[in-house]
C-alpha cells in the first residue's frame, strides 16, 4: 500500500490518540497537501521541526496499527462484504436496488 494512503487511513482510525497539534499538522500535510514550509509558517516553527513531528507521528500510527490491527481488520471486513455481495448478486439474482441496500446496511455494521 502506498505510504501516503496508508497513513491517511491510519489517521482515520487513530488520530484521536494524537495530540491536537499532531492532528492539526498531520491533517494539513496529508489531507490539505500543504508543504512542510507552509505548515512551518502556519505554526511559526521550522520546516525541520514539522518534518520531525510528521515522521514521529507516522511511526506512532504504524505502531498503533501493529498492536491493534484495526486497519487490517477493516480491510479484511470490507473485502469479505464485497465478496459476499458479489456472491449474493450472482447466486440469487439480487436486483441492483437490493444490492445497494444490502451493501449500505453491511457497511454500517
From Swiss-Prot:
Q: Which Pfam families match?
A: UPF0122
* Database matches in InterPro entries: RNA_pol_sigma_r3/r4-like, UPF0122, UPF0122_fam_protein, WH-like_DNA-bd_sf
Q: Which NCBIfam families match?
A: PRK00118.2-2, YlxM
- Task of the protein: Might take part in the signal recognition particle (SRP) pathway. This is inferred from the conservation of its genetic proximity to ftsY/ffh. May be a regulatory protein.
Q: Which family does it belong to?
A: Belongs to the UPF0122 family.
Protein name, per record: UPF0122 protein CLH_1195
- Origin species: Clostridium botulinum (strain Alaska E43 / Type E3)
Amino acid at each position: 500500500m502506498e505510504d501516503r494512503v496508508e497513513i491517511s487511513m491510519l489517521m482515520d482510525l487513530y488520530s484521536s490518540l494524537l495530540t491536537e497539534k499532531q492532528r492539526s499538522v498531520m491533517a494539513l500535510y496529508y489531507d490539505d497537501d500543504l508543504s512542510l514550509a507552509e505548515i512551518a509558517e502556519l505554526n511559526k516553527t521550522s520546516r525541520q521541526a514539522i518534518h520531525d513531528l510528521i515522521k514521529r507521528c507516522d511511526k506512532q500510527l504504524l505502531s498503533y496499527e501493529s498492536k491493534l490491527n484495526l486497519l487490517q481488520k477493516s480491510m479484511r471486513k470490507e473485502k469479505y462484504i464485497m465478496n459476499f455481495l458479489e456472491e449474493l448478486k450472482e447466486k440469487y439474482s439480487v436486483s441492483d436496488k437490493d444490492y445497494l441496500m444490502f451493501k449500505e446496511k453491511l457497511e454500517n455494521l
